[in-house]
Amino acid sequence: MPDDFYRFKSLRIFFASDNLFTTYPEVLGRCDALDIVGFKSNNIKVIPASALNLNLRWLILTGNKIEALPPSIGNCKRMQKLMLAGNQLASLPETLANCSNLSLLRIAANRITELPEWLLGLPNLAWLAFSGNHIKQDFTFADAQELNFEQFNLKELLGEGASGTIYKAERSNGEAITNVAIKIFKGNVTSDGYPDDEMNAYIAAGSHPVLVGLLGKVNFSKEKKRGLVMNLIPEDFFNLGAPPSLESCTRDIFNTGIGLSKLQVLKVANSMASVAQQLHARGIIHGDLYAHNILINENGDTLFGDFGAASFYNKNNAVVSFYLEKIEVKAYGYLLDDLLSICVEEENPSLVELARLRDLCLLPQHAERPGFDEIVEKLTALSD
């Protein structure tokens, strides 16, 4: 980059994805107004200590060759969102503990051997993905039924995400034809991690009324791609929220016309607490507990999915288990905050109690946040 690039004094957002940078440009450290920087899918190996300006709030370095972060990253006190998946990091600098505003961290698909307590104890960390590292796991992966790809006839595209594309498909068993959904994985590392880890987490999550039902897995041998076969989501379901914007950074955004009743809010809150309780009982942190991954209908019935950021953890490690559950509880607290913000009913005792629960979930001290067992208990009492 030009040595005088710093002359762009008002530049706030800079993306340079899919290029051939091998060193993070030092001159960017002199662009004082930079708020968001993205160097996804380059060949960056080195980040000079002076290259990270103090104003950074969102830094994307997914899919590079970075072996170490400079300790100077701890000076980025505004940092809220840090995307580091798909690099060669063996550890993180302890100075990152100074980034107390960090809310979302993606470190999947690296070479990290442990999650240090100073990292897990960050007061605002709510969304964490760390699968595909060298962390010791005492976990036997569940498996799903292998289905014959010849049973399926792919129809229209339903959606596309970082890890794969979802199609509507017809499934024929010789007698009847049923409609299903198939997610075909792209096979590359994403901003959240490896597709294999997503598949394993979805399978291990098990059956739950809120999870989109998993029917099995399928191999498309000709294309050398794999997929998961799921129940087709009924047409009356819609996305509760939309992913964060450049401005909102870590918080979902909502259509101006959306408004939920008290009943809908309580049903979604109950449903999400229940499924999170099951996941953590199985040693799984979802890592992306957001309204944009939730589908609801007019009755408040809820469906949840997208395990792209999910990670397994050792339930026998009491310290790690404690922190990872309380980190996800923080994310759940933000979800409650979102639900209350789009509720159209006037304040009543149930909503007041839900607001109190939100405040508990968002406390900076992990030990003072409730666990999901306690949250489910409180919500059950509210719904009675």
Per-range role (PLM):
Residues 1-3, 24-26, 47-49, 69-72, ...:
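The feature encodes a structural signal of leucine-rich repeats
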Residues 164-203:
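ATP-binding glycine-rich loop module of kinase domains
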Residues 276, 280-296:
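Catalytic-loop of the protein kinase fold
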Residues 268-269:
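Activation segment signature within eukaryotic-like protein kinase domains
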Residues 303, 308-360:
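C-lobe/activation-segment region of protein kinase-like
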Residues 213-226:
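Short beta-strand micro-motifs within the conserved protein kinase catalytic domain, predominantly
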